[in-house]
Swiss-Prot record:
UniProt pathway: Porphyrin-containing compound metabolism; chlorophyll biosynthesis (light-independent)
The protein's name in its UniProt record: Light-independent protochlorophyllide reductase subunit B
Co-factor binding comment: Binds 1 [4Fe-4S] cluster per heterodimer. The cluster is bound at the heterodimer interface by residues from both subunits.
Taxonomic path: Bacteria, Bacillati, Cyanobacteriota, Cyanophyceae, Gomontiellales
Underlying gene: chlB
GO biological process: light-independent chlorophyll biosynthetic process; photosynthesis, dark reaction
Entry superkingdom: Bacteria
Catalytic center residues: 293 (proton donor)
């Protein structure tokens, strides 16, 4: 457990509740003190849905600490079963309530004797895993539970006559998941593949027994769905594709892998003409990468940071498809760091694997990129350093749950990424116009370091003079001046200090 005011991936129970609330007619019960019950508020605020979040908190209070939790937890499970009539109730503790070391499995067994719904306890170690790992495991657990049930009742169906696919890992609170799901369905329809099931988003647990009838599973996000796909491969011999179709090159690679699996399964398909048509005529990305607009970006420096799926894909797109120099690429998925390093090593100069936001901020400040591609936190860092930022991965705020259609996957996703990349760089003329006519670039310079350890102060005259320096070199001048001041023991930076530093650097 770690005390922090910013986390890239939340605690384990958030992942479990994301999976439970993604399914249709599944209720989550969180055994937790009041401080841990923010999931409902967060989901209700961010997801644009009309229904209430199906999660109830079984509050751990002083009465529970005195008497034990069993009576209260069992009562909450049976009460929700009677009120909501769910198909499944998922009980999860939080890392805080896990300290009590209670036998929650016993509570579940007892409660299930008097409920119509199935009841399971999330099989997650709340001290060792984060939100993404817990989501992956909970999805696998629910799939296992219902397929074991179907197998015992002899209800496992045969494979469909024509090619079909399950899309695994589409969840609530995912980064552009709803739009990505729509785009993947369109892509599968264009390839002549029927979408059998999409889980967990809006899926019924009663339909999970239909999963084995698909020809293969598609796992667009490495973080959630991979464990379920591996289970289905082991138990039912179902192949899976775990290539995220982000960017023209990776989308083509994903489609070719699908083609290989279908042809091995007895189909006879050739998608090369489709790939060529989409790449040349439908997606604007290939044309954009050859245009003068993109050539203006060639050689510009950028940094990339996010979850594994999006950070890897974005690094490859910037480096391989747009000629942008990725100074470093990073991920907060430390548990899967080896895979990340292996994927990006040929496309960037350096790799950063950490979930410490201060370390990420300092790494950005050190290399002074022309643009940042990261999470909501890197957006804040960019504003403090006056560096533009495109948001490419969770965690994100409300502006990355857009009302309009903005997928990141598939061929339409490549167009969206092109727009994001181009609009993230401050163009030269825009910079000058902001200087001439006023705008966001003329406000007072923020003079804090990212780690908030600055021991220097700027006078008003010094800041005014600093503001006169063009935006694209202002950050560098500011840092050089502060280094000059520290070396000479100057605590207050005036106009004279600024000029003295300039002369020292020039000399």
């Amino acid at each position: 457990m770690k005390l922090a005011y910013w986390m890239y991936a939340g605690p384990a129970h958030i992942g479990t509740l994301r999976i439970a609330s993604s399914f249709k007619n599944v209720h989550g019960i969180m055994h937790a003190p009041l401080g841990d019950d923010y999931f409902n508020v967060m989901r209700s605020m961010l997801e644009r849905e009309r229904d209430f979040t199906p999660v109830t908190t079984s509050v751990v209070d002083r009465h529970v600490l005195a008497r034990g939790s069993q009576e209260k937890v069992v009562d909450n499970i049976t009460r929700k079963d009677g009120e909501e009539h769910p198909d499944l109730i998922v009980l999860t503790p939080t890392c805080t309530s896990s300290i009590l070391q209670e036998d929650l499995q016993n509570f579940v067994t007892r409660a299930s004797l008097s409920t119509q719904a199935d009841v399971i306890l999330a099989d997650v170690n709340h001290y060792r895993v984060n939100e993404l790992q817990a989501a992956d495991r909970t999805l696998e657990q629910i799939v296992q539970f219902y397929l074991a049930k179907a197998r015992a009742e002899g209800e496992i169906p045969d494979r469909t006559a024509t090619p079909s696919v399950n899309i695994l890992g589409m969840t609530t609170l995912g980064f552009h998941n709803q739009h990505d799901c729509t785009e993947l369905k369109k892509l599968m329809a264009d390839l002549g593949i029927t979408v059998n099931e999409v889980i967990p988003a809006n899926a019924s647990v009663h339909n999970l027994k239909r999963l084995p009838q698909a020809w293969f599973n598609l796992v667009p996000y490495r973080e959630v769905g991979l464990m379920a796909a591996r289970y289905l491969e082991t138990e039912f011999g179902m192949p899976y594709v775990d290539i995220a179709p982000m960017g023209v090159v990776e989308t083509a690679r994903c489609i070719r892998k699908i083609q290989q699996i279908l042809n091995q399964g007895g189909a006879s398909v050739d998608y090369e003409e489709f790939i060529n048509t989409q790449t040349v005529h439908v997606s604007q990305a290939a044309w954009f990468s050859r245009s003068i607009d993109c050539q203006n970006l060639t050689g510009k420096k950028a940094v990339v940071y996010g979850d594994n799926t999006h950070a890897v894909a974005m690094t490859k797109i910037l480096s391989r498809e747009m000629g942008i120099k990725v100074v470093w690429a990073g991920t907060y998925c430390k548990y899967d760091g080896d895979w990340f390093r292996d994927q990006v090593k040929d496309y960037c100069d350096d790799v950063l694997i950490t979930d410490d936001h201060a370390q990420v901020g300092d790494a950005i400040a050190r290399v002074e990129p022309a643009a940042i591609f990261g999470t909501q936190m890197e957006r804040h860092v960019g504003k403090r350093l006056n560096i533009p930022c495109g948001v490419i991965a969770a965690p994100v705020h409300i502006q990355n749950f857009p009302v309009g259609y903005r997928p990141f996957l598939g061929y339409e996703g490549t167009n969206q990424i092109c727009d994001l990349v181009y609009n993230s760089f401050t163009l030269g003329m825009e910079d000058h116009l902001l200087e001439f006519f006023g705008g966001h670039d003329t406000k007072e310079v923020i003079h804090k370091g990212i780690s908030a350890e600055s021991d220097l102060t700027w006078t008003a005259e010094g800041l005014t003079e600093l503001n006169k320096i063009p935006g694209f070199v202002r950050g560098k001048v500011k840092r050089n001046t502060e280094k000059f001041a520290r070396d000479r023991g100057i605590s207050e930076i005036t106009v004279e200090t600024l000029y003295a530093a300039k002369e020292a650097v020039g000399a």
